Amino acid sequence: MTIAIGQNQERGVFDLVDDWLKRDRFVFVGWSGLLLFPTAYLAVGGWFTGTTFVTSWYTHGLASSYLEGCNFLTAAVSTPANSMGHSLILLWGPEAQGDFTRWCQIGGLWTFVALHGAFGLIGFCLRQFEIARLVGIRPYNAIAFSGPISIFVSVFLLYPLGQASWFFAPSFGVAAIFRFLLFLQGFHNWTLNPFHMMGVAGILGGALLCAIHGATVENTLFEDGDAANTFRAFTPTQSEETYSMVTANRFWSQIFGVAFSNKRWLHFFMLFVPVTGLWTSAIGIVGLALNLRAYDFVSQELRAAEDPEFETFYTKNILLNEGIRAWMAAQDQPHENFVFPEEVLPRGNAL
């Protein structure tokens, strides 16, 4: 008989907090929740506050709130004025000096929402890592979520950091994002950027893979049953697979001549395509922040300038980009007092 004599170790504060954070509850908190919940709450709350009450008159010369007559598609939390540079515009900083109304007027809510939103997304990614570790599964969900994080950080933070000020970032609103897309096209020819092309291929390719995969699984479900839909035929305790990979493989082998024969490779490919698209788009946006150019077909531009009868879709788009720049520069930066005489506005062969 062995008798073990020991002393109970006192549990430290860290262990007590760790137990409380990881307690089984309806909404898991965890250590990641200490970052996620406050930042996400403040970002969403700041956005609702801005779109409801705060004007963009002092930063953009625009109405941007429900209070001023905007609707869900036209309301926005707009970026600070160009004169603010890259200031964080803290409420207690030299710009607002603790005046909340003044802080809202000069665009403080935008930096508030952008920074808290970025940390909220990072917190959600860490939440997926934390729960995956506790449950005992691989962290591919968190790895996949790095794609949206890279897009948010590159578009809302890195791009304006490479430009003159936060003013050139997108404002947080539907129509505001559309304006930003037109800006990227006019000033950077974004649609002809190879990183944008890879991003489009990744996102649309991921959507296509998702649709094909869902349809194929529905087509090859076991035990359909007599119900109007196939969902009730599934039971969590059934011993066999939900669908037939062999049948799906045979179907697509007949369609294309090739098919995925391995579920792991199939699902990794479905993960890889859209996430790679998001990352390549983010890399492209960082390139735009540094004013890297897209494809230039100068020979076509020179020939179009010399020959009135020669024009391509590329040269037409270049002229449209010039029109966007001429219009947006004066509209977006009224403090610069840009004046464009009629003779310098773009007039192409077909415009």
From Swiss-Prot:
Fe cation binds at residues 213, 267. It holds the Pfam family Photo_RC. Gene3D superfamilies: Photosystem II protein D1-like (1.20.85.10). GO terms for biological process: photosynthetic electron transport in photosystem II. The chain crosses the membrane at residues 39-59, 123-139, 151-164, 206-226, 277-293. It is an enzyme of class 1 (oxidoreductase). It is a multi-pass membrane protein. Its main location: plastid. The D1/D2 heterodimer binds P680, chlorophylls that are the primary electron donor of PSII, and subsequent electron acceptors. It shares a non-heme iron and each subunit binds pheophytin, quinone, additional chlorophylls, carotenoids and lipids. There is also a Cl(-1) ion associated with D1 and D2, which is required for oxygen evolution. The PSII complex binds additional chlorophylls, carotenoids and specific lipids. PANTHER family: PHOTOSYSTEM II D2 PROTEIN (PTHR33149:SF12), PHOTOSYSTEM II PROTEIN D1 (PTHR33149). This is Photosystem II D2 protein. It comes from Heterosigma akashiwo (strain NIES-293 / 8280G21-1).
